[in-house]
Amino acid sequence: MGFIDTIKARAKADKKTIVLPESEDRRTYEAAAQILKEDLANLIIIGSEEAVKKGSEGLDVSKATIVDPEKNEKTQAYVDKLVELRAKKGMTPEKARETILNDYTYYGVMMVKMGDADGLVSGACHSTANTLRPCLQILKTKPGTKLVSAFFLMVVPDCEYGDDGVFVFGDCGLNQNPNPEELAAIAESSAESYRMLTGNEPRVAMLSHSSKGSAKHADVDKVVEATRIAKEANPDLALDGELQLDAAIVPSVGASKAPDSKVAGKANVLIFPDLDAGNIGYKLVQRLAKAEAYGPMTQGIAAPVNDLSRGCSAEDIVGVVAVSYTHLTLPTNSLV
């Protein structure tokens, strides 16, 4: 059984109720049909019955719950709660109603906030900012969270690196140019996400164009400082930097460029220095190595809400639903 098949088996065993708010996108219905066929989750699709019927033509989504915000008896409760949560920001009943009726991501997040759903997956036709803004406004962050960030779970076929091709890449979707403290926080969160997803111990590489002082630049200094901060805060975590990509994952190169490192040559968590590098990096691996890329999945929000790439396929949505809502309940035994 492959890694993602194991994840799907976990999803079936502990089904969550997931909101899919993007009823205007055909991929939502293609994914929903597959999720329901595989019995991976209970689904809520937000939209009018007419819109859902038209959008899902030729697909079986009959087991999904269709919630029409205009007709749902709980809509007023969501309006009232949104006013309560955002009153200090000037939210009025009229504005709250307009917001949740015109933006189904807001509506879906309110369903999660009120306990009517376990989580939400969105972003196939909305930007990351538009997807995560309501989450940060309404759900807030987990206690103790230093920074909300995003990661991709990468599953690379026929790959000898990482844990048989399984990696976490962070941050590839949210923080543009993190400072050393933020980069350290991304590393900490990504390591914990890897541990929860796979049951394996993370080996974290702080990536750079330099390995152990081979280049001098302010960008390198940032990664060096982030590595120091993360190590001091997490002395038991296998984490090292700064490392070039080949030194991080190729054993022979790691032994040559960083012979004293416990991470070099065997990293399974790759932390990119900025969003440009991370976004380009995951897409290169996805497109050229034919990797499965699940995400960007958020770290640090108080409830499981996850973004999608606007270039995602229906199968990508299926994978994100399966992965996102099993990692919180995975046992500690290894899955890879």
Walk through the language-model features, giving the residues of each.
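Contiguous, glycine/small-aliphatic-enriched amphipathic segments in soluble metabolic enzymes
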Residues: 1-126, 134, 186-205, 216-268, ...
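Gly/Ser/Thr-rich active-site loops/lids in small-molecule metabolic enzymes
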Residues: 139-154, 189-192, 220-241, 289-302
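A structural-propensity feature for long, helix-poor, extended segments
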Residues: 155-179, 305, 313, 321, ...
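Short, glycine-rich nucleotide/cofactor-binding loops
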Residues: 16-27, 171-184, 214, 309-314
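Short beta-strand elements
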Residues: 149-158, 168-172, 273, 286, ...
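Conserved small/polar residues in nucleotide/adenosyl-binding loops
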Residues: 326-332
